[in-house]
Amino acid sequence: QCSRTSFIFCGSKRHMMTDIFYSPAKPFFQSVISQSLHPIPMETYIEFAGRMFAERGKFIDKFAVEIVYKMFEGCTWYIQMMMNELFALTEKDMICTPEYIDIAWDNIIMAQEDRFLAILHNLAPKQKQILMAIAKDRNVEGITSSEFIKRHNLVSASSVQAALKPLLKNDIVINEDGKYRIYDYFFADYLARIY
């Protein structure tokens, strides 16, 4: 038994978190107060990255941090992944400039290619097809529109909906404000490159 104890459950898999706490079939149903966290401010990242690089005798251009922050819309995991790679690419007493970003991006995608292929291997053909279409368009509004379906040679609105359902459930694709996108920025770029 616990008294005067608070628990914090956190995670970026929104579907899973919602299911745990807001599904009547789950034991934690309506037992929490939900709070969404907003992105850490860009200035905080600029200061933090500059300090971390400097502590190890390296430097990073403020503009490089701004570019990375905007690429990932303030999403911490992706920013940290990119900053870690940029740090590894930067020699001691050197300055990491925006030119390093493409190299870091390519390195991350190459390092994760096996994971991306495993995801694709586990998808049905129609799921792959809709995933490729989303990757090409990046942010998709009107995913069941005839224009989107024709442009990507998809079968029908109902087949798009059927293929999309498991992609959403597994957080491979997310819907933000009526726009669909691939959740993992690196996976999205990988798909756009190869297909």
Task: Please report, for each region that a protein language model flagged, where it lies by residue.
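Sensor-1/coupling segment of RecA-like P-loop NTPase cores
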Residues: Q1-A25
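C-terminal leucine-rich, beta-strand-based interaction scaffolds used for sensing/assembly
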Residues: D114-Y195
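Short, flexible helix/strand-to-coil boundary loops that buttress conserved ligand/catalytic motifs
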Residues: I20-F21, A49, M83, D177, ...
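Conserved RecA-like P-loop NTPase ATPase core
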Residues: L37, V68, I130
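Amphipathic alpha-helical "lid/sensor" segments that cap RecA-like P-loop NTPase cores
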Residues: I46, G50-R115, P125
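Non-catalytic, well-ordered alpha-helical scaffold segments
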Residues: G11, E66, T76-Q80, N84, ...
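Short glycine/proline- and charge-enriched loop/turn segments
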Residues: P24-V32
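Conserved AAA+ ATPase "SRH/arginine-finger" region at the nucleotide-binding site
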Residues: I33-T44
